[in-house]
Amino acid sequence: MKILTFQHKDILNELKNKGVYLANINSFYKQQTPKCYNTVFNSIKVKEPGATQPIFGWKKVLNKELIVDSETIKRCLEMTYLEEDEYLLFELNIDDDKVSLQNFYNFVDARCEEEGIDPYYENFEEFPIDTIFEIEDGEIQATFSSIRKEYIENVYSYKKINNEYEITKINF
């Protein structure tokens, strides 16, 4: 399955040195919304030993299949609020059974509900958690437990110039 993921520049060195990157930190977001993170992590059929939380990426953006272009990068950064100078774009090919797909907006709704931000339901248990897996349309996020060197098809840096992103392929 083709996936795009934005990862901190340090991840590239970890992949070069170790051959694999695992999400085994207790991130701020996982601490704030552990039920949502555990739900998507547990939905991954085949997990890398040692991984403790999902890595996030994209399967579909702007309601179309992925291509590495300025429009796709702009939309992904709008949704994730990443610091563009600190991240690289990884184009991955991962076996389907190692990936779980979710509707980005339904996942965000679930996180907001769990965190108590503008709650619609009286408690998180009332939130229809299965809606995060409704992926017929929209922005589709992908979660997986590791990035292995062999998953990487391309790595790109990007820089915003005049409201467009200049994309540079990095030799890996």
Annotate each predicted stretch with a short phrase.
Residues 1-52:
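ADP-ribose/NAD+-binding catalytic cleft of ART/PARP-like enzymes
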Residues 60:
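Conserved catalytic/binding loops enriched for acidic/polar residues
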Residues 44-48, 57, 66:
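Compact, well-ordered interaction domains used in eukaryotic information-processing assemblies
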Residues 10, 19-24, 51-53, 63-172:
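Conserved NAD+-utilizing ADP-ribose enzyme module
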